[in-house]
A protein has these predicted regions:
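A short, Lys/Arg-rich alpha-helix, primarily the initiator
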Residues: 1-12
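Helix-turn-helix DNA-binding elements, focusing on the entry/boundary residues of the two helices
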Residues: 6, 17, 28, 43-46
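Residues in the recognition helix of alpha-helical DNA-binding motifs
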Residues: 9, 23, 34, 63
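The alpha-helix within a helix-turn-helix
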Residues: 10, 21, 50
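Short alpha-helical DNA-recognition segment
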Residues: 14-33
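Short, charged recognition helix plus adjacent turn
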Residues: 33, 40, 51, 61-68
Length: 68
């Protein structure tokens, strides 16, 4: 499987941002920040994301907005 961004993984399972955020018990803004690389999810949320989006951790790419 090709690597997926968080947004691509979400879209692949047919979820909009509002629904995914609700399922993950986070705000739409937080999910948007994760998808845009502004911030990153904590490890316990990554497990929830993988389950909700039906992907393995190794299949995901986490964007970084301001790389060093």
């Amino acid at each position: 499987m090709a690597k997926l961004t968080l947004k691509a993984a979400r879209v692949n399972v047919g979820l909009d941002q509002k629904t995914a955020a609700k399922e993950l018990k986070i705000s739409n803004k937080t999910l948007g920040n994760w998808e845009n690389g502004v911030s990153a999810p904590k490890p316990e949320k990554i497990d929830l994301i993988c389950n909700l989006y039906k992907v393995n951790y190794d299949d995901l790419i986490f964007l970084v907005a301001n790389p060093l």
